Design a protein with these regions (language model features):
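A conserved structural/catalytic subdomain of Rossmann-like adenosyl-cofactor enzymes
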Residues: 1-173
């Protein structure tokens, strides 16, 4: 039948790690295998020892047909009540109404002012190295084999969304 799990994480797993790094490869595997169903942003200051923003990642290895190839993002960051007295860094709790609104939004799987739905390809990118030739007196420096040497001081990188064709991207952006 399949399994669905929810994991509470900070923001780092969403964006850390260059393409090919461990973090990036884990994220890539989850998305390529169509297991990321939803990410819910939570209010900050929900936990005792930190005020950081947190997120619930919902993973599902048996998505319904309408959810296949898609990721639902829900902004639940405004659904909280302030505590009368802070408990360490914890100064908020998710309100009952907020929990119900998040759950209903998740179940409905429709875009709204707090819900966005994207194709999986929206979340991946290819990291491309952009080189410029090393020049001496305005002439490109080459190796003994005749290859142009790159100027490492001018090296740059482009993060190209998987949904874009690399050649089209460079024509349009670089």
């Amino acid at each position: 039948k399949g399994s669905r799990i929810g994991i509470v994480l900070n923001g780092s797993p969403m964006f850390t790690g260059d393409g090919g790094s461990g973090e990036s490869e884990i994220r890539k595997w989850i998305i390529e295998n169509d297991m990321l169903e939803c990410i819910v942003s939570l209010p900050n200051s929900l936990f005792f020892n930190t005020g950081i923003s947190t997120y619930i990642w919902i993973l599902n290895n048996n998505k319904t047909e309408e959810r296949q190839g898609k990721v639902q993002l829900i902004n639940g960051s405004n659904f909280f009540n302030k505590l009368r007295k802070n408990l360490g860094d914890k100064s908020k709790e998710i309100s009952k109404e907020g929990r119900n609104k998040i759950i209903d939004t998740y179940k409905q799987f429709k875009e709204s002012d707090i819900c966005y739905i994207f194709n999986n390809s929206h979340f991946g990118y290819t990291k491309v190295t952009v080189e410029q030739p090393l020049e001496k007196d305005g002439i490109a420096v080459t190796t003994k084999q005749g290859k142009v040497k790159p100027d490492t001081k001018k090296r740059d990188y482009e993060r190209i969304p998987l949904s874009d064709d690399i050649e089209d991207y460079f024509e349009r952006e670089v």
